């Protein structure tokens, strides 16, 4: 797939005014925006609606992880907002993942449903401590869940794409940095590196949101690809 809008700008703010101000300074023809738990917990659907009114497609990053019935109902509610993309935690298991996909089918939704694999904040030692196995083993287990449930793709480190590779899936990579600090992502990469490794969509936050001219920075990143 070759979607020209490869960049998803992460709205990592604690106030709606900051998020809307950034949206006013970005071109919706060049990117999509990610609304995460911080903004959504505080403002609910209103933040999604306000940003959509500005012409942006939304990746609703809530990482649902609960019993199948609860996740099904949560997905139904989220899909009613007509978001472009929605995610769940694949560690919730096959039944939960199938429930999320069933919600999408029942809504006849075109929203992309993707699964979070191993968080980019986790080191290899963290993976051993949490999963009791190497990172690669856990990734393969989660890949199997995603394929069985037939979801649309993965949230993963660009360095994990080779392990998760499947021609029918899309790959969304957080922790992408353009010449700045990696923050708490152990598996960060530059935008060009992430695309070369097989990513379809790049989640970029501070590199753009922390710039005084965010749209110029966005255009610079796009040119670098």
Give names to the regions the model predicted.
Residues 8, 34, 59, 84-87, ...:
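Conserved beta-strand positions in the central sheet of alpha/beta enzyme cores
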Residues 9, 33, 63, 86, ...:
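Conserved, mostly hydrophobic/aromatic
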Residues 23, 48, 75, 97, ...:
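Generic hydrophobic/aromatic pocket-lining and core-packing "Φ" positions
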Residues 81-93, 178, 187-217:
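Glycine-rich phosphate-binding active-site loops on the catalytic face of alpha/beta enzymes
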Residues 28, 54, 81, 149, ...:
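Structural motif
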Residues 31-85:
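Metabolite-binding pocket within alpha/beta catalytic cores that recognizes anionic/polar moieties
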Residues 3-5, 66, 70-161, 167-168, ...:
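Conserved anion-binding
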Residues 25-26, 51, 78, 146, ...:
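Generic structural signal for hydrophobic
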